[in-house]
Regions:
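Residue-level signal for the nucleotide or nucleotide-sugar donor/cofactor binding architecture
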Residues: 18, 48, 86, 100, ...
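Nucleotide-sugar-dependent
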Residues: 19-26, 33-54, 59-72
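A short, well-ordered alpha-helix in the C-terminal region of glycosyltransferases
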Residues: 90, 97, 104-118
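C-terminal alpha-helical cap of glycosyltransferases
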Residues: 121-138
Length: 138
């Protein structure tokens, strides 16, 4: 259904599955990456593709509830924009706005790359170890 809805669009492409070693190249090729969180799942999930997108230095369009971690990350770091999934016109306007402002899009991509290290496996493991050690001291 999603592919049918975008049929004929020159702005949207659906790519076949790629082997893991090709993923960084695929992520780096996109002008803007969409990360979605279904309403009701905020606070429960953060799609793992977000971290690859940040590492690739690409901007994010977070289509997610305001309370989601994805929206918090995007807003706090300036690596993209957010729109509520229950407001399709807001999503469309976010895309239109970014399409008209390639400099802003490029800035968001740079911010994504700058903050990617905060979310890599090593940083996350260090944070986890710190939390566990602090809990053990209590």
């Amino acid at each position: 259904q999603v592919e049918a809805a975008a049929a004929g669009s020159r702005a949207v492409r659906f790519l076949p599955f790629r082997p893991a070693e090709q993923v960084p190249y695929v992520l780096a090729a996109g002008d803007l990456h969409v990360v979605t969180v279904k309403p009701g799942l905020e606070g429960v999930v953060v799609p793992s593709k977000l971290y690859g997108i940040l590492a690739a230095g690409r901007p994010v369009l977070a289509i997610a509830p305001e309370e989601s971690d994805v929206v918090r990350i995007v807003r706090r770091t300036g690596c993209g924009v957010a729109a509520d999934p229950r407001e399709p016109e807001a999503v469309a306007e976010a895309v239109r706005s970014l399409a008209r402002d390639p400099e802003r899009l490029a800035h968001m991509g740079r911010r994504a790359r700058e903050i990617a290290h905060e979310y890599d496996r090593v940083s996350q493991l260090e944070k986890f170890v710190q939390v566990v050690e602090e809990a053990g001291r209590r």
